[in-house]
Amino acid sequence: MTRIYGIILILVKFIQTTTPIQICDIGASPVDKTEFIEILLDKTNSNIIGFEPNKDEFIKLEQSSKKKFFNYAIGDGKVHNLNICYAPGMTSILKPNYEYLKLFHKFDEWSEILKVISIQTKKLDEIYFDNSLDLIKIDVQGYESEVIKFGDDKIKNSLVIQTETSPIPLYENGKPFSYVCNQLENLGFNLHMFSKIHNRSFKPMIFNNSIYSGLYHLFQLDCVFVKNFKEIDELDEENLKKLILIMFYSFKSYDFVDLLVSKLEVKTKKNYLNQYRDLVKTLKMQKLY
């Protein structure tokens, strides 16, 4: 057993793919860690192609034979203004929703627009990839719905979508969690889990001596959408294996993986389930919420 990034991982050697898992990172700024991607790159046969429009953040990205990044935005294919904010993680095509953000600590500072640059966006569906996308991460600060709208063909043919949304939009003209959820459900996905739940406290209250802590209010949700069960039953062996590896390494959804492995066993007539369950007995599991 190896402890990496604070969690216990064991390599699933008995489940291997013949083609790489293709990851697509839309909004690839390194300002927020993406451990769920790094683990997959480290532990499986996988590659990543990413897109980041903010030049200052783009130049921080590490390129390699497995990591290719491009300095442009994914969207509706039109020219837009990119609002560069004081906090790089708040930079967006959309303008911050100041009336809402001012209710919380520090966001009036973090959301300040320092400069505006004109950018040409590209539709996800118009970008050529050597292979179909398996895991798509969308972190575009309120612009998720447009990425999905103009990338629905690529998205509906993928396996897992990880996206950051908010029940109440943090940006003007942004769509709420419910809207994005409906978009992805219409493309054959179900909401499986929240990989992170971000709470914030309303000013002036502070919890745990930290402005980053909240009591109950749901500020942002890192959502994991997975192919619905009908779609899963129609996956071929290769894609089912990819889904298993993504859900095992990236999201630690061990009971769901058990279900997927049982489906793989039926499909291939090979004994995977006993090996997997022996492996699971050695894992230390912890609920996120």
Pin down the residues of each PLM region.
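Phosphate/nucleotide-binding beta-alpha loop and adjacent structural elements of enzyme active sites
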Residues: 1-289
